[in-house]
């Protein structure tokens, strides 16, 4: 992936626990607010829990009823830590697979950026979300591996 980064893509930051992926994304989000509208970070576990309660994922996909009434840049933090599937009154859904599928379509049509942090490697992503999602990661994202020991104390 060296030398093949693109400003048209979002970021996919992955690596071991505690290496600073979420902190990097929070800093990047704050910086982007100075230049553009920025973006919010949403913890994937919270998204799955919200689906279990309301059954609604519009905010994270087409956003017709939230923010500014259209899709916006967004970061999904801690992908792979959410319940799979989430259950809304008997309707089971792999929430993040569904969201990433829609965000891919939005990226194709309008280059809408999505950002992700995860501890999962590409093989784990395929096992959790399928080959369709894994296959599109490099097309939609600049992939960055963050290595090192945990920085938590």
Each language-model region and where it sits:
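Motif I (Walker A/P-loop) of helicase-class P-loop NTPases
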Residues: 25-29
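Hydrophobic anchor at the beta1->P-loop junction of P-loop NTPases
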Residues: 13
């Amino acid at each position: 992936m060296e030398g093949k980064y693109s400003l048209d893509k979002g970021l996919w930051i992955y690596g071991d626990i505690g290496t600073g992926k979420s902190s990097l994304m929070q800093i990047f989000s704050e910086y982007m607010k100075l230049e553009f509208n920025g973006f919010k970070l949403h913890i994937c576990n919270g998204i799955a829990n919200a689906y279990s309660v309301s059954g609604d994922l519009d905010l994270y996909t087409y956003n017709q009823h939230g923010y500014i009434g259209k899709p916006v840049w967004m970061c999904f933090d801690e992908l792979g830590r959410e319940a799979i599937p989430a259950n809304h009154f008997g309707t089971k859904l792999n929430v993040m697979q569904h969201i990433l599928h829609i965000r891919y379509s939005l990226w194709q049509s309008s280059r809408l950026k999505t950002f992700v942090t995860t501890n999962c490697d590409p093989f784990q992503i395929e096992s959790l979300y399928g080959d369709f999602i894994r296959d599109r990661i490099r097309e939609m994202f600049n992939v960055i591996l963050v290595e090192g020991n945990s920085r938590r104390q």
